[in-house]
């Protein structure tokens, strides 16, 4: 789920997430096959960026990470990223010992005004995730391909929110990636969280 620090405290969010996780596990347990064959579920959060994110309580910040991976999904602003953004991401890495993963970069390519600063942070441990939908349109596919070839994309995800209008559609993106990139690259881009 999304964590918007301007709307709720980390403690309130974690309680809400715990309840949602329990409801999901209960629904899966009630299936005839008890969810055999379903992917492993790992709790995490997509944390909305704010300049003081790096100042959050370390325990709360760790609890927002994907399971025990130390990876924090961060939803970035769509306006231009100045040095304050890069400073915050760097402080998450070095002062909080958290690996930020920028969520759905395909929504904010243009916000990256300093690709060299982004590449430097990638070299320090920053991860970047792209939505599978970025590989469906001609223009978005061109940008996605350039970012993947430049080594800036570490994971491709579905951005699934529900089973109606935000389904986990990965097969088309996976097929395209396997066709146009090395098989090993495709496997890495679609790897499970924490691997």
Task: Annotate each predicted stretch with a short phrase.
Residues 3-7, 49-50, 107-112, 135-139, ...:
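Active-site environment of divalent metal-dependent phosphoester hydrolases
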Residues 7-129:
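Extended substrate/RNA-proximal surfaces in nucleic-acid metabolism proteins
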Residues 67, 150-151:
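Structured loop/turn residues at beta-strand edges in well-structured enzyme cores
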Residues 116, 127-130, 135-143:
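A C-terminal functional module that forms or caps the active site or interfaces directly
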Residues 120, 146-147:
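Well-formed, non-transmembrane alpha-helical positions, independent of function
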Residues 142-145, 151-153:
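Flexible, acidic glycine-rich loops studded with aromatic residues
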Residues 152-168:
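Short acidic/histidine-rich active-site segments
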Residues 170-195:
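Mid-to-C-terminal alpha-helical segments outside catalytic/metal-binding sites
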